Swiss-Prot record:
Region annotated SM 2, chain positions: 344-357
Residue runs in coiled coils: none
Name the UniProt record assigns to this protein: U7 snRNA-associated Sm-like protein LSm11
Family: Belongs to the snRNP Sm proteins family.
Taxonomic lineage from the root: Eukaryota, Metazoa, Chordata, Craniata, Vertebrata
Keywords, comma-separated and alphabetical: Isopeptide bond, Methylation, mRNA processing, Nucleus, Phosphoprotein, Repeat, Ribonucleoprotein, RNA-binding, Ubl conjugation
GO CC annotations on file: histone pre-mRNA 3'end processing complex; nuclear body; nucleus; telomerase holoenzyme complex; U7 snRNP
InterPro entries linked: Lsm11 (IPR039267), Lsm11_M (IPR034109), LSM_dom_sf (IPR010920), Sm (IPR047575), Sm_dom_euk/arc (IPR001163)
Glycyl lysine isopeptide (Lys-Gly) (interchain with G-Cter in SUMO2) cross-link, renumbered residues: K121
Source organism of this protein record: Mus musculus (Mouse)
Compartment list: Nucleus
Gene that encodes the chain: Lsm11
Length: 361
């Protein structure tokens, strides 16, 4: 504050003819910038057209490049009397503010240099110029999976695009958290750079993942094991079909023999009836004796058959109850090696599950 008051007094005391103080002279070694900032009027500048820079970096770039149009010219105020010092100071302050607010004049050399550095990408058919000349903003071409697929030519993804163009079937090996899951054979429709695929008309051969304790004991699945298991299942199915056909034929034969036995029983009943009719002509005394003998024989037979039937039914009941208890104790056996096949109209396979892709033979 003392320096400020001292600078103000010295400026008021000085006459227009007297030389400026060395502390307010810009070209002097004893120049005091703080005192010049708090002075009531601007100190005289030896070069009135000197450019004004915003910071030191801008000044360094000016020294390196030699550009002269970046700065703003600042004029020097004429010395005024002590009475008109306040008016001149306010006028100089307003003019400096207006100059600071004004935009800097563009440098034509710099603009030409930037234009030379710009690279214009023109299309082969010359449509870029027509787009720029046309009114309004030009529409960008759509960018999606279908437009990016042809850009992978000359790479493994380019071979996938060739399979799409030519309609070649592909085999896609997919995996689970442990190893191989199965093989999908179908026609490729779309893909992306992450190997996500969409297929149609797919035949899948797969095995369900092994869980529980069998996961630790089970060996990793391979293609040979997968298809060998499938062949084994097909052969076992054929054997089961042949066995079922043989059983059907034996059942049909058994049904025919049972019908023949029933017919023979019916024939015996008819013969018994005819013999009964003939026995009516026999005397009553002979008929009574024959009836008593037949009754005694029938009673003996029934007692034997009842005992045997009771024992047989009891033994059968015990065996059935034991068999049922055993069946309840037994757990259903799960075949973890079973291979399944199915047909899918369309399927999406994530790229993280793809192991291998090759052409179907």
């Amino acid at each position: 504050m003392e320096e400020r008051e001292w600078g103000a007094r010295s400026a008021r005391a000085g006459s227009p003819a007297s030389p400026p103080s060395p502390r307010l002279d810009v070209s002097s070694y004893s120049f005091d910038p703080l005192l010049a900032l708090y002075a009531p009027r601007l100190p005289p500048i030896p070069y009135p057209n000197a450019p004004c820079f915003n910071n030191v970096a801008e000044y360094e770039s000016f020294l390196k490049g030699g550009r002269t149009g970046r700065g703003r010219a600042r004029g020097t105020g004429e010395p005024a009397s002590a009475g008109t010092s306040t008016g001149t100071s306010t006028g100089a302050g307003s003019s400096s503010r207006a100059r600071r607010r004004a935009a800097p004049t563009p440098d034509p050399e710099r603009i030409q240099r930037l234009r030379r550095l710009m690279v214009v990408k023109e299309d082969t058919d010359g449509t870029a110029g027509a787009r720029r000349q046309g009114p309004g903003r030009s529409k960008k071409a759509p960018r999606n999976v279908l437009t990016r697929m042809p850009l992978h030519e000359g790479s493994p993804l380019g071979e996938l695009h060739r399979c799409i163009r030519e309609g070649v079937k592909v085999n896609v090996h997919i995996r689970t958290f442990k190893g191989l899951r199965g093989v999908c054979t179908g026609f490729l429709v779309a893909f992306d750079k992450f190997w996500n695929m969409a297929l149609t008309d797919v035949d899948e051969t797969y095995r369900k993942p092994v869980l529980g304790k069998a996961y630790e004991r089970d060996s990793s699945l391979t293609l040979t094991r997968l298809f060998d298991r499938l062949k084994l299942q097909d052969s076992s199915k054929k054997e089961a079909d042949s066995k079922s056909a043989v059983e059907d034929s034996t059942l049909s034969r058994y049904s025919q023999t049972s019908t023949w036995k029933v017919a023979s029983v019916w024939g015996r009943g008819d013969t018994d009836r005819s013999s009964h009719r003939r026995s009516r002509s026999v005397p009553s005394s002979l008929q009574a004796s024959a009836r008593e003998e037949s009754r005694s024989e029938l009673s003996g037979r029934t007692t034997r058959t009842e005992g045997s039937s009771v024992g047989g039914t009891f033994s059968r009941a015990t065996t059935l109850s034991r068999g049922q208890s055993r069946k309840k104790k037994r757990k259903p056996k799960v075949d973890y090696q079973q291979v399944f096949t199915r047909h899918i109209n369309q399927i999406f396979i994530r790229g993280e599950n793809v192991l291998l892709v090759h052409l179907a033979q």
